[in-house]
UniProtKB/Swiss-Prot annotation:
Cellular component per GO, a single term: plasma membrane-derived thylakoid membrane
Keywords, ordered alphabetically: Membrane, NAD, NADP, Plastoquinone, Quinone, Thylakoid, Translocase, Transmembrane, Transmembrane helix, Transport
Subcellular location: Cellular thylakoid membrane
Family note: Belongs to the complex I NdhL subunit family.
GO MF annotation list: oxidoreductase activity, acting on NAD(P)H, quinone or similar compound as acceptor; quinone binding
Domain of life the protein comes from: Bacteria
Residue ranges of the TM segments: 2-22, 39-59
Protein name as catalogued: NAD(P)H-quinone oxidoreductase subunit L
Membrane topology: Multi-pass membrane protein
A Pfam family recorded for this sequence: NdhL
Reaction catalysed by this enzyme: a plastoquinone + NADH + (n+1) H(+)(in) = a plastoquinol + NAD(+) + n H(+)(out); a plastoquinone + NADPH + (n+1) H(+)(in) = a plastoquinol + NADP(+) + n H(+)(out)
Name of the gene encoding the protein in the UniProt record: ndhL
Gene source species: Nostoc sp. (strain PCC 7120 / SAG 25.82 / UTEX 2576)
Length: 70
C-alpha cells in the first residue's frame, strides 16, 4: 500500500510540483543570469521536460505589452 503512494507522490512531484517551481524560477531569473547559472537552467529544463510539456498548454510566456505614455 505504501509503495503505490510513494510512486504517486514521486510522479506528482516530477510532473507537476517541480516544473511549476522551475517555471517561476525561469521567469524571475531569465534576463539576469550568469553563464553558469544559464547552463544549470538548461539542465533543469532537460531533466524536467515531461512535466514542462504537461504544463505547457496552461502557461503564457509571452511578454506583456508595453505601456506607452504620451
Amino acid at each position: 500500500m505504501i509503495v503505490p503512494l510513494l510512486y504517486l507522490a514521486l510522479a506528482g512531484a516530477y510532473l507537476l510540483v517541480v516544473p511549476v517551481a522551475l517555471l517561476f524560477y525561469l521567469k524571475l531569473r531569465w534576463y539576469v543570469v550568469s553563464s553558469i547559472e544559464r547552463t544549470f537552467m538548461y539542465f533543469l529544463v532537460f531533466l524536467f521536460f515531461p512535466g514542462l510539456l504537461v504544463l505547457s498548454p496552461f502557461v503564457n510566456l509571452r511578454p506583456r505589452p508595453r505601456k506607452i505614455e504620451v
